[in-house]
Amino acid sequence: MALDVQSDIVAYDAPKKDLYEIGEMPPLGHVPKEMYAWAIRRERHGEPDQAMQIEVVETPSIDSHEVLVLVMAAGVNYNGIWAGLGVPVSPFDGHKQPYHIAGSDASGIVWAVGDKVKRWKVGDEVVIHCNQDDGDDEECNGGDPMFSPTQRIWGYETPDGSFAQFTRVQAQQLMKRPKHLTWEEAACYTLTLATAYRMLFGHKPHDLKPGQNVLVWGASGGLGSYAIQLINTAGANAIGVISEEDKRDFVMGLGAKGVINRKDFKCWGQLPKVNSPEYNEWLKEARKFGKAIWDITGKGINVDMVFEHPGEATFPVSSLVVKKGGMVVICAGTTGFNCTFDVRYMWMHQKRLQGSHFANLKQASAANQLMIERRLDPCMSEVFPWAEIPAAHTKMYRNQHKPGNMAVLVQAPRTGLRTFADVLEAGRKA
């Protein structure tokens, strides 16, 4: 392991120990034998308060192309809930390890680097994108790494995510941290932003173009809030769908052309049997929803793209309202996985159904650059202390979270800090 400790960080005094308390800083580059982590075990599968428990575990070792990052803050995503529940699959079925540390977003400090790592050094401030691969197949070398047979999501399909004092990542996962953001702001956006970026720009020829119209489900949530901003930045028009009227101003403030409250309509859930009385009633309501879109886009102008992630509850409507030759792009199924649709509208109107999963490094970096250039807002809604990581996930699971993205503090002792020096100073005053 190479330990290049030349950095811009001012020297500070700290004892060398085998375990540090949360918020306590080791000497730069010193890797303790153990660390605190919120661990999930197979026998605890269930809701977050049951599944996630604090444990003292071994600090991960790294190989030649890996990096150890001291985690300042982490983001809260739905895959942490899935990992805890063991639904739709248990992470243990994949990585076979005795415990699982969730967390697929983080900001932090490079703490140790493998001897083949050239682009990063100890002391660098970074954010982490969550795609990993083995790097040795044709998709990783000239294709799209997201299609690699070894592609996996760090913190969900790997056991060593960000809800711990240290995390092990591949060097290619690291990106520069936007210096104008706090540690917690920098920790909350990478997974959702990069996912939204690929959905909108990653599936040619249906990549988003200026002037096009996009329907965005869950427009006030973490994923939707970035979709609205990216669509607006690209010179296209976002039509946001909300479920609570008090979220309208938030979505319009992000740059949406218009907002629709889905509770004004009754066409949700699985598609009724085609041509049944229930189907006819569903179609009448779905067309009312389509007319609400026209109130924003203009009469007869259907959306070019539907930004899908609820899945089961909304998919029948999504596949109906997208225009001829348009695309429904979907990255999740937060309301259920049994997606139904009337295939007649699909083949006759030659619509595209496109699955989308996170992003490759080029896409994640392009999205991150927009954040560095201050073209996007991280839309951080709430920050939780280390001790409340399960509570943050429970809030998301029960759909009680505020509009935007949630973050949790790990080694950062409080909110509002922007540099490592800030962290050290806050630690001395604590």
UniProtKB/Swiss-Prot annotation:
Annotated cofactor note: Despite some sequence similarity to zinc-containing alcohol dehydrogenases, this enzyme does not bind any metals.
Enzyme class: oxidoreductase
E.C. no: 1.3.1.85
SUPFAM superfamilies: GroES-like, NAD(P)-binding Rossmann-fold domains
Highest taxon listed in the record's lineage: Bacteria
Gene Ontology molecular functions: crotonyl-CoA reductase activity
Induction: Down-regulated in cells grown photoheterotrophically with succinate.
Effects seen without this gene: No effect during photoheterotrophic (anaerobic/light) growth on succinate or 3-hydroxypropionate, no growth on acetate under the same conditions.
A Pfam family: ADH_N
pH dependency: Optimum pH is 7.5-8.0.
Gene3D superfamilies to which the protein is assigned, alphabetical: Medium-chain alcohol dehydrogenases, catalytic domain (3.90.180.10), NAD(P)-binding Rossmann-like Domain (3.40.50.720)
Keyword vocabulary terms for this entry: NADP, Oxidoreductase
Record's keyword annotation contains Oxidoreductase: yes
Catalysed reactions, as listed in the record: (2S)-ethylmalonyl-CoA + NADP(+) = (2E)-butenoyl-CoA + CO2 + NADPH; (S)-methylmalonyl-CoA + NADP(+) = acryloyl-CoA + CO2 + NADPH; butanoyl-CoA + NADP(+) = (2E)-butenoyl-CoA + NADPH + H(+)
Subunit structure: Homodimer.
Alphabetical list of PANTHER family matching this protein: QUINONE OXIDOREDUCTASE
Role of this protein: Catalyzes the NADPH-dependent reductive carboxylation of crotonyl-CoA ((2E)-butenoyl-CoA) to (2S)-ethylmalonyl-CoA, in the presence of CO2. This is a key reaction in the ethylmalonyl-CoA pathway for acetyl-CoA assimilation required for R.sphaeroides growth on acetate as sole carbon source. Is also able to accept acryloyl-CoA as an alternative substrate, yielding (2S)-methylmalonyl-CoA. To a lesser extent, when CO2 is absent, the enzyme also catalyzes the reduction of crotonyl-CoA to butanoyl-CoA.
Family to which this protein belongs: Belongs to the zinc-containing alcohol dehydrogenase family. Crotonyl-CoA carboxylase/reductase subfamily.
NCBIfam families: crot-CoA-red
Protein name: Crotonyl-CoA carboxylase/reductase
